[in-house]
Amino acid sequence: MNSSSSRSSMSMPMPMDMPQMHMGMNNNCEMNQMMHPIPNFPMKWEPCTPPDEKPHPSMLFPPLSGIFNQSRHSSTGEDYHGSSSGSPSSSLSSPNEFKDEPLGLDVHFGNSLFNAPFSPSATSSHSPSSYGMMHGSHSMASHQLHQQQLSPLPSVAHFSHSHHLQHHVVQHPSQASLQMNMNQIFSGPSHQYASSSVPHTFLFKDSTIYEGMGGMGLAAAQQQLKARNKMHEMAIRQHLITDQNITANGDLVLSAEERRTLVQEGYSIPQKYPLTKSEEESLKIVRRKIKNKLSAQESRRKRKEYIDALEGRLHCFSEENKSLKKQVHQLEASNRDLQQKLHQYESKEKM
């Protein structure tokens, strides 16, 4: 009997004290939290829920009234860190805050984003620390992704509070870089704004091509003007035309070529100064024709000289070619003689 009672007492588990039971429950909860960590909510703390149970909708999505009725930070005494409301326009401050800044951008909103201390509390998204706001939104986004994987409900990320928070937080560094670039642009006193009158170096990749083309056109025009002046001087020197002095008075003396060309073209021959408008035009036309004739004669003469020079070079090259051919024939004949002598010597050595 005693042995049976002792055996039963050994087999029965000993009752645990209440503090030990609570300690075991706390350990189990801590193990669940370590295996299934739940990040901090930006709105409030919620109790730990097992992964097999569906969370309450208030844990996933905060009430809309709390989102839209949150008070904005005052611009006096603290930096601007962005509003946590759901309105897209809430990220902008009042016009009076930015009246001294270009484009309505705040210069100091990036300082709190990187210089503020990290706040791991649940209300870090509502604190003046933008880093805590960014951390809270990131943790809430990861928790919502985990809950969406467990829940059969479709995702409504466009209604979530973290979507607006991430939108504001992501926009701040780009706005800070934009503000820095704008400060660099507006700060330079010698900066010139781009307008429609932009030089060719900004319109084309390689402006040297177009500048080179302009230089070539200028050189061609200068060469043409030089040729005309040369023809005019040559015509005067050969007494083909006479200088036209409009302010002169008295008799007009024309060259024989001018008189002949005037008659040939059907114009009247002027006799005295001052000349009428028609007489001036007729003399200009006649003198231009004489210059063109002289220019054509010069071009034909130069062409004939060039052809004569080419013919002379051709004659010289042909004579040189003939002499080289004679030398080749002589060398071939001497080579044949040497080969015959070599064969004779080889035959004598064999004998």
From Swiss-Prot:
PROSITE patterns cross-referenced by the UniProt entry: BZIP (PS50217), BZIP_BASIC (PS00036)
Stretches assigned to the bZIP domain: 282-345
Cystine connections: none
Region Disordered, annotated ranges: 46-104, 119-149
GO cellular component, one term: nucleus
This protein's UniProt keywords: DNA-binding, Nucleus, Transcription, Transcription regulation
Region called Basic motif, residue ranges: 284-304
InterPro entries: bZIP, bZIP_sf
Sequence similarity: Belongs to the bZIP family.
Record-given protein name: CREB homolog crh-2
Source organism of the structure: Caenorhabditis elegans
Phylogenetic lineage: Eukaryota, Metazoa, Ecdysozoa, Nematoda, Chromadorea
Gene: crh-2
